[in-house]
Amino acid sequence: MRQLKGKVKETRKQKKERKLDNLETQAKIRTVVLPALGVLAVFLVLFVYLKTRPAVLA
């Protein structure tokens, strides 16, 4: 069997499926990853704030 030279053409169906997969992945990124990063950022800011504030003398 001979191998084809160059890139193999993508059919319309394959291209459509790939685009749908990319849209699903982007939706997951927006609904899972970004909120998780937001929570981590809030914890980091809170941690730094609590560690750098002056001690309260009782």
Swiss-Prot record:
Q: Which Pfam families match?
A: DUF4519
Q: Could you tell me what this protein is called? A: Single-pass membrane and coiled-coil domain-containing protein 4 homolog
Q: Give compartment(s).
A: Membrane
> Domain of life, per the record?
Eukaryota
Q: What membrane topology does the annotation report for this chain?
A: Single-pass membrane protein
- Principal subcellular localization: membrane
Entry annotated with the keyword Transmembrane: yes
Q: Which family does it belong to?
A: Belongs to the SMCO4 family.
Coiled-coil intervals: 1-31
- Which segments cross the bilayer? 31-51
Q: Name one GO cellular component term.
A: membrane
Kindly indicate whether the keyword Cell membrane belongs to this entry: no
Keywords in alphabetical order, please. Answer: Coiled coil, Membrane, Transmembrane, Transmembrane helix
Species of the source = Drosophila melanogaster
